[in-house]
A protein has these predicted regions:
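Beta-strand elements of repeat-based all-beta scaffolds
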Residues: 1-56, 60-257
Length: 257
């Protein structure tokens, strides 16, 4: 599209793609886009086609770095704040995700965006500068035929969430329960049951662990995965029932209690 302004003609709402030596664009890789207002965004890519720099119309930019599996290991925003992701030796399981507490210096930016950057080594040396979430995994044999199940996640405050999974049946490989701990103290538990469509049909949440009290909710769905009926039992046996209706675009149109 073209727009004329002050006697000048500009192309807007336009995308430019990269091409190989034969002049072909095989992988739908953009190098530049111009929006309807004429703002231009540019994209730099590595040898594998991953976007490593995005330059905005105002000259600010974001940076990214990738591992050998083409998974993002570094993202640096326009202000210099970084998110670092450390994977296992295979480059597939996320072990740590860290967000910088302060903008990085240019030296650190150069370090984290360099080829062959090692997030594990870097985070070990710079833990104090990041808020870090870490993950532990079950052995691949824990649930037959399903690998990569997270056993526990520790947030930046040190709170630990432990996960258990269904080993067979309808919900095989889906989360059976979550347990939140503060140190060795159980703070909260949530357990799940699933229907034949693998949607959560029942959710049981601890209300008062010391008194063994739990609140229960049950759910029904339509064929578009919208929740149509919610039964909230609280800690009792009589539910408060809520019914929801949706239009053909899955927008909620009515709710009755």
């Amino acid at each position: 599209n073209t727009v004329e302004t002050d006697g000048q003609t500009y192309e807007v709402d336009k995308i430019t793609y990269s091409t190989d030596e034969d002049g072909e664009n095989k992988y739908d890789e953009m190098i530049e886009s111009v929006d309807i207002m004429g703002n231009t965004t540019k994209y730099d890519r590595d040898a594998n086609g991953n976007v490593i720099k995005t330059t905005n119309a105002d000259g600010t930019y974001t940076l990214a770095n990738y591992n050998s599996k083409n998974s993002v290991v570094v993202e640096v925003d326009e202000l210099g704040y970084a998110t670092i992701k450390a994977y296992d030796s295979n480059g597939t399981r996320l072990l740590k995700e860290a967000t910088s507490l302060h903008p990085l210096s240019q030296t650190d930016i150069n370090t984290v965006t360099a080829d062959n950057f090692d997030p594990v080594t870097y985070l070990a040396a710079n833990e104090a500068s990041y808020a870090i979430t870490s993950h532990e995994y079950y052995a691949d044999s824990y649930v037959s035929g399903i690998a990569g199940l997270i056993r526990a996640t520790t947030d930046p405050e040190g709170n630990v969430t432990e996960y258990d999974y269904y080993k067979d049946g309808v919900g095989k490989g889906l989360v059976k329960s979550k347990t939140l701990k503060d140190g060795n103290t159980v703070v909260n538990t949530v357990s799940y049951e699933y229907n034949a469509q693998l949607q959560v049909s029942k959710e049981t949440t601890s209300f008062d662990i010391s008194k063994n009290l739990y609140s229960v909710k049950e759910y029904e769905y339509d064929k578009f995965n919208n929740v149509t009926v919610t039964r909230d039992y609280g800690t009792g046996s009589t539910p408060a029932t809520t019914v929801a209706e949706y239009d053909l675009l899955s927008r909620k149109t009515a709710e009755y209690a």
